[in-house]
Amino acid sequence: MARVKRGVVARARHKKILKQAKGYYGARSRVYRVAFQAVIKAGQYAYRDRRQRKRQFRQLWIARINAAARQNGLSYSKFINGLKKASVEIDRKILADIAVFDKLAFSALVEKAKAALA
């Protein structure tokens, strides 16, 4: 049986990992063994944080809506409850944008929510 030399395959694999580790600090971008671990860990962080990003944005939107609603004399939970009762179907992302960029429109929504709660 002929001897199989794997130099080409190994070099390609190493090159691929080192390319992914480009921009990392120190040995993490130069030494294959360290770079491999760094790339694996980076992938784990990326996977986790793609899910966390969704949570964090929702938290941000809720904080913005809450602040704007309280400026208009209503808590976040009562505001959302009022919108549901008034059959206003605007998601939190859009509500947060309205709260930041169009205060008059947000005030109108708060009044609508107050009317539905009364």
From Swiss-Prot:
Keywords: Ribonucleoprotein, Ribosomal protein, RNA-binding, rRNA-binding. GO terms for biological process: ribosomal large subunit assembly; translation. Gene3D superfamilies: 6.10.160.10, Ribosomal protein L20. The keyword Transcription regulation does not apply. It comes from the Bacteria. The keyword Transcription regulation does not apply. GO terms for cellular component: ribonucleoprotein complex; ribosome. One of its GO terms (molecular function) is rRNA binding. InterPro entries: Ribosomal_bL20 (IPR005813), RIBOSOMAL_L20_CS (IPR049946), Ribosomal_protein_bL20_C (IPR035566). PANTHER family: 39S RIBOSOMAL PROTEIN L20 (PTHR10986). Binds directly to 23S ribosomal RNA and is necessary for the in vitro assembly process of the 50S ribosomal subunit. It is not involved in the protein synthesizing functions of that subunit. Belongs to the bacterial ribosomal protein bL20 family. This is Large ribosomal subunit protein bL20. It comes from Pectobacterium atrosepticum (strain SCRI 1043 / ATCC BAA-672). The lineage of its organism: Bacteria, Pseudomonadati, Pseudomonadota, Gammaproteobacteria, Enterobacterales.
